[in-house]
Amino acid sequence: QALPPMGRASSISRTGGTDRMGEPVLVGDVGGTNVRFALAERRGGKVEISDFSKLSGDSFETFAAALRRYLQDTGLEPKHACFAMAGPVRDGEVMLTNRDWHVSARHLCEVFGFDDIKIINDFTAMARSVPEHSGDYFEEILPGKEIPELPVIVAGPGTGFGVASLFPLGDDAWQVLTGEGGHIAYAPRDALEFDIASVLMRTQGYVSNELVASGMGLEFVHRAFCEVFGRNLEDISPEEMRHRADEGDEMFDQLIAMRAKAVMGAVGDLALANGALGGVVLAGGVTERIVDYLRRPESVARFRERGPMSGYLANCPVRLMHDPEAPLIGAAAYYAQETLK
């Protein structure tokens, strides 16, 4: 039961289809920045989504308000839903990590009249989407040969830093385990990283991989670099930082390189700890913008160099998944699989 691009995967369709299987499911992807909704159905083995909408989280005081806007705008009256939320989920409830929203499945059922709602971690959905994608959605970062029966790590920085482990169960079924792996402590490995980490420890306290590599931590990392390099702090965008790095600005080049090495070191740690020789799949907007930095020799070394165990990850492939709607696909696949139990 290998993952794409080597093995089989259900294809994804966003229009049309026949052989309807099951009732439509409202799916949502709720991150620290945006809220995405769509209606999902599985037809003939394909997950199909329609009525897609992307809303800014800042425009709403609560998740329920965003959901109400979507339902009003589309006129849909779904009875089943699965929402992927960026935060730890317990007993059908979640407090978002990077937004002050508390969401309860029971409360939403009472307010909106759903028959059932499943709330899952956003990276549970991201991970569950991986086997639903064909090889066209994947870009190779590090070549290798996966061992199909072993776990896969799915991770990546966006606003935060999501992490999940994907286990093949056979018969096209998958188990996803999530925690808060992005909050594992950051491990500096060279002099500059120790200097930056020292500043972050003084200003932020606990220094996690999420703080170093994700969107929410970029401002703090930028401040630390300015202090270490003796530069004045400027209010500039991530795009401008990248532009300056491309133009030869050493500080911004080193800043992006440190974040890329943090990503590769983190997923290497996770693969090592989980025996995840099924491969690593990266996702998230930050990752897509630093692909060239992820391929640098020093980033590759962070993934593979493990002292006496350096050979362990030598053939473990790393791929980047390109699909902004992946969590919606994964939420639908998760709901369908759980409903069939």
Question: Where in the sequence are the language-model features?
Answer:
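ATP-binding/phosphotransfer module of carbohydrate and carboxylate kinases, centering on a glycine-rich
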Residues: 6-7, 12-77, 170, 194-341
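Solvent-exposed alpha-helices and their adjacent loops that cap or buttress functional pockets
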Residues: 19, 30, 143-149, 154-157, ...
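Short beta-strand scaffold segments in enzyme catalytic cores
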Residues: 35-39, 154-156, 161-167
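Short beta-strand-loop/turn "lid" adjacent to the catalytic site in phosphate-handling enzymes
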Residues: 72-119, 124, 128-137, 154, ...
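ATP-dependent carbohydrate kinase catalytic cores
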Residues: 116-147, 239-260, 265
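A short, charged helix-loop
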Residues: 179-202
